Structure formats: structure tokens, C-alpha cells
């Protein structure tokens, strides 16, 4: 199966490869450019979800013979007065079916919040604060905060695995629309 992924980020690509492998689904992963309509730092659950779905649809259309398009989007949501960084994955197939998965979310450090809420990408804020380049393409902010015990890869892997769950053969009857 050819799986198109709406990113060039190696963390996301590896997470998609490993999620499909985790469930024994043979897949050739092909990176595709992210759509230009996706903001660099989506704020709000609907905006993050929309970004993931747009990435998945654009990837599916961009890669010839792809059976799945996968989009992974991280963004900011508010819950209980706390701002969290959340990762959402969407998988779209050629038949138009979309499945969604969420990864773990973590609390955004207060010094980052105003810039992130104004649309500055979390990775850029973290790179400036910690004076380290390419954090988003490496361990991610969560990797810095946890000293690499949990990395951006782990958040991406969890989100994609959750989006794959309804597609697993033993779950097919559970997820049929009534």
C-alpha cells in the first residue's frame, strides 16, 4: 500500500511508518508537501483538526496511486483554563473515508503562550528560548521538556495509531456507519 504523508518532517514520516508497521500493515510511505492553506500554528481544536484533514487530503491527491493520505497537525487547545499542545492525525482514503486520532497533549510553558497564541509556530518559539535549532524536526518541545524521555515522535506515533484503529480488520464492523 502506498501511503502519502502531508509533510517533509522526518519525525512525522517515521511515526507514520512505525504506526503502520505496529499493526502489520505493509506500507510504502511517500512524503508530500503540506498545503499552503494550513497555518504554521493552528489555535483551537477545530483549526488543528482541519489542518490534519487538509494535509491528509492534499497528500492523497499529490501522490499517484496512494491508498491513504495521512496528515499530522500539532496546535493549541484550551481546556479548563489551561493551554495545551495537542497532536491530531487524520487518515483519508481514496473512497473519501476519514478517520481521526489524537495523541497525548501537554501544557504549554507560560513564557511561550503569548507568541504561540499570536500565530508563531511553537518550534520557532522553543528554538529561540532554548537557543537550539530545528527542535521541531528533532525531539520537539516535549523532548526538550522531558529530556528526550518523550519526544515529538512519540506524540505523532500515538496520534497515527489512534487514527488507524478504526481501519484495523478486526474493527471493521464496529466502525460501519449505521
Swiss-Prot record:
Source domain of life: Archaea
Family annotation (SUPFAM superfamilies): ITPase-like (SSF52972)
Cofactors that this protein relies on: Mg(2+); Mn(2+)
Key words, A-Z: Hydrolase, Magnesium, Manganese, Metal-binding, Nucleotide metabolism, Nucleotide-binding
BP GO annotations: nucleotide metabolic process; thiamine metabolic process
Enzyme Commission code(s) on record: 3.6.1.73
Pfam families on file: NTPase_I-T (PF01931)
Keyword Amino-acid biosynthesis: no
Reactions catalysed: XTP + H2O = XDP + phosphate + H(+); ITP + H2O = IDP + phosphate + H(+)
Cofactor-binding details, from the entry: Binds 1 divalent metal cation per subunit; can use either Mg(2+) or Mn(2+).
Record InterPro entries: ITPase-like_fam, Non_canon_purine_NTPase, NTPase/PRRC1, YjjX_NTPase
Molecular functions (GO terms): ITPase activity; metal ion binding; nucleotide binding; ribonucleoside triphosphate phosphatase activity
Record family assignment: Belongs to the YjjX NTPase family.
Functional note: Phosphatase that hydrolyzes non-canonical purine nucleotides such as XTP and ITP to their respective diphosphate derivatives. Probably excludes non-canonical purines from DNA/RNA precursor pool, thus preventing their incorporation into DNA/RNA and avoiding chromosomal lesions.
Record text on subunit structure and interactions: Homodimer.
Protein name per its UniProtKB record: Probable inosine/xanthosine triphosphatase
Higher taxonomy: Archaea, Thermoproteota, Thermoprotei, Thermoproteales, Thermoproteaceae
Amino acid at each position: 500500500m502506498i501511503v502519502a504523508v502531508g509533510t517533509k518532517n522526518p519525525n512525522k514520516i517515521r511515526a507514520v511508518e512505525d504506526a503502520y508497521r505496529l499493526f502489520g500493515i505493509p506500507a510504502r510511505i511517500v512524503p508530500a508537501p503540506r498545503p499552503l492553506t494550513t497555518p504554521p500554528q493552528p489555535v483551537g481544536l477545530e483549526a488543528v483538526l482541519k489542518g490534519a484533514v487538509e494535509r491528509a487530503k492534499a497528500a492523497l491527491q499529490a501522490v499517484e496511486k496512494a491508498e491513504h493520505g495521512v496528515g499530522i497537525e500539532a496546535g493549541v487547545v484550551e481546556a479548563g483554563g489551561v493551554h495545551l499542545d495537542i497532536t491530531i492525525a487524520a487518515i483519508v482514503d481514496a473512497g473519501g473515508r476519514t478517520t481521526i486520532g489524537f495523541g497525548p497533549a501537554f501544557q504549554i510553558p507560560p513564557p511561550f503562550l503569548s507568541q504561540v497564541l499570536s500565530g508563531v509556530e511553537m518550534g520557532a518559539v522553543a528554538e529561540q528560548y532554548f537557543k537550539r535549532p530545528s527542535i521541531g524536526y528533532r525531539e520537539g518541545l516535549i523532548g526538550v521538556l522531558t529530556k528526550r524521555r518523550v519526544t515529538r515522535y512519540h506524540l505523532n506515533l500515538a496520534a497515527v495509531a489512534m487514527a488507524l484503529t478504526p481501519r484495523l480488520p478486526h474493527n471493521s464492523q464496529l466502525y460501519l456507519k449505521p
